[in-house]
Swiss-Prot record:
Protamines substitute for histones in the chromatin of sperm during the haploid phase of spermatogenesis. They compact sperm DNA into a highly condensed, stable and inactive complex. This is Protamine TP17. The keyword Zinc does not apply. It comes from Oncorhynchus mykiss (Rainbow trout). It comes from the Eukaryota.
Length: 33
């Protein structure tokens, strides 16, 4: 049976990811010896 969307009075807002600067994006970079 087809899935039904939840009926809500208010429109559903999609959560937007906070803007991440490209420079800061490399967080878990490992040092190679």
């Amino acid at each position: 049976m087809p899935r039904r969307r939840r009926s809500s009075s208010r429109p559903v807002r999609r959560r937007r990811r906070p803007r991440v600067s490209r420079r800061r994006r490399r967080r878990g970079r490992r040092r190679r010896r």
